[in-house]
Amino acid sequence: MGFFSSLSSLFGLGKKDVNIVVVGLDNSGKTTILNQLKTPETRSQQIVPTVGHVVTNFSTQNLSFHAFDMAGQMKYRSTWESYFHSSQGVIFVLDSSDRLRMELLKDELMMVMEHKDVVSRGIPIVILANKMDIPGAMTASDITVALGLNLYRSGTWSIHSTCALTGDGLDKAMQQLSAEITKYMESRRT
């Protein structure tokens, strides 16, 4: 079996390693989402707030992800951009029930979407509208309008409703991200 996996990697048939940056305001559910994406036997039983960054590894059908889970507290947000240049994708997690911080959220999201490394390289961005299970949470379409996402060219970003606690919506979002990253990597080879 080791021989065949080595052979498939040699011919480019194995899983491709990719780096992604996972950002968003504090308490949006970034770490819980990444924990949900891991295999059941590797999931943590207790989630603690991220300080600085933590690397989490997980896989989809064709990609092996190295996710840089970035702290969302204000004092750490300036470090996000130093990871964009070596990433093939960005996940931006937001708390869809946190209406009070929508303006701040918009500013931080625009910083990511307009960052020179993200724009010049065409890095795909998947926005996870998390905590959709909370009563009064905004819908993905309401968030799109509130954040002005409809002003950005489609194809560079997508938004998905999720619930980190149950995993609802994560499969679809990761399929989208995997497809966009695969397309991105293929375009970089030509």
Curated annotation (Swiss-Prot):
Gene3D superfamilies: P-loop containing nucleotide triphosphate hydrolases (3.40.50.300). GTP binds at residues 24-31, 69-73, 130-133. One of its GO terms (molecular function) is GTPase activity. It comes from the Eukaryota. GO terms for cellular component: axoneme; cytoplasm; cytosol; dendrite. It is found in: Cytoplasm. This is ADP-ribosylation factor-like protein 6. Keywords: Cytoplasm, GTP-binding, Lipoprotein, Myristate, Nucleotide-binding. Belongs to the small GTPase superfamily. Arf family. A lipid is attached at G2 (N-myristoyl glycine). SUPFAM superfamilies: P-loop containing nucleoside triphosphate hydrolases. Its main location: cytoplasm. Transmembrane segments: none annotated. The keyword Lipid biosynthesis does not apply. GO terms for biological process: cilium assembly; intracellular protein transport; intracellular transport; PERK-mediated unfolded protein response; protein localization to cilium; vesicle-mediated transport. The lineage of its organism: Eukaryota, Metazoa, Ecdysozoa, Nematoda, Chromadorea. PROSITE patterns: ARF. Specifically expressed in ciliated cells.
